[in-house]
From Swiss-Prot:
Organism: Thermus thermophilus (strain ATCC 27634 / DSM 579 / HB8)
Protein's gene: rpsM
CC terms in the record's Gene Ontology section: cytosol; small ribosomal subunit
Protein name: Small ribosomal subunit protein uS13
Role according to the record: Located at the top of the head of the 30S subunit, it contacts several helices of the 16S rRNA. In the 70S ribosome structure it contacts the 23S rRNA (bridge B1a) and protein L5 of the 50S subunit (bridge B1b), connecting the top of the two subunits; these bridges are in contact with the A site and P site tRNAs respectively and are implicated in movement during ribosome translocation. Separately contacts the tRNAs in the A and P sites.
SUPFAM superfamilies (alphabetical): S13-like H2TH domain
InterPro entries: Rbsml_uS13_C, Ribosomal_uS13, Ribosomal_uS13-like_H2TH, Ribosomal_uS13_bac-type, Ribosomal_uS13_CS
UniProt entry keywords in alphabetical sequence: Ribonucleoprotein, Ribosomal protein, RNA-binding, rRNA-binding, tRNA-binding
Domain of life: Bacteria
Residue numbers spanned by region Disordered: 95-126
Self-association state and partner proteins as the record states: Part of the 30S ribosomal subunit. Forms a loose heterodimer with protein S19. Forms two bridges to the 50S subunit in the 70S ribosome, contacting protein L5 and the 23S rRNA; these bridges are straddled by the 5S rRNA.
Lineage: Bacteria, Thermotogati, Deinococcota, Deinococci, Thermales
One Pfam family linked to the record: Ribosomal_S13
C-alpha cells in the first residue's frame, strides 16, 4: 500500500478513487493532482512505480492542508465563531442547523434523536 499524507490508500483501486480516501481530497482535487504529476487516473495504486508515488506524495502534501492539520483548522474556525458569539457560533453551540434550514420539522441529524414531551392528559368525560 502507498502511504500519502499519513493514510494508507487502498492498493486495488484506481488512483483517482484511492486519493479520495484522504481527508481533504475529493474527486476534483484528486484529478488535479494526477494531472499536475502526469499520472494516468485509470492506473491502479498497486501498478504505480515508487517514483510516481513519491511525486504524488510530494505534490499532495505540499499543496494542500490535509488530514489532522485540516481537521484542526476546521475545529478552530468553529471555535472562533462560538467565541465571538455570532449567530453561526450560537447555532453550533446549540447543536442546531447553521445555514438557515428549518427546525420546526426535520433537522434530526443535527438535533439528534427526538426528546418526546408528554402531552396534556384529557379529562375523563362524565
Amino acid at each position: 500500500m502507498a502511504r500519502i499524507a499519513g493514510v494508507e490508500i487502498p492498493r486495488n483501486k484506481r488512483v483517482d478513487v484511492a486519493l479520495t480516501y484522504i481527508y481533504g481530497i475529493g474527486k476534483a482535487r484528486a484529478k488535479e493532482a494526477l494531472e499536475k504529476t502526469g499520472i494516468n487516473p485509470a492506473t491502479r495504486v498497486k501498478d504505480l512505480t515508487e517514483a510516481e508515488v513519491v511525486r504524488l506524495r510530494e505534490y499532495v502534501e505540499n499543496t494542500w492542508k490535509l488530514e489532522g492539520e485540516l481537521r484542526a483548522e476546521v475545529a478552530a474556525n468553529i471555535k472562533r465563531l462560538m467565541d465571538i458569539g455570532c449567530y453561526r457560533g450560537l447555532r453550533h453551540r446549540r447543536g442546531l442547523p447553521v445555514r438557515g434550514q428549518r427546525t420546526r420539522t426535520n433537522a434530526r441529524t443535527r438535533k439528534g434523536p427526538r426528546k418526546t414531551v408528554a402531552g396534556k392528559k384529557k379529562a375523563p368525560r362524565k
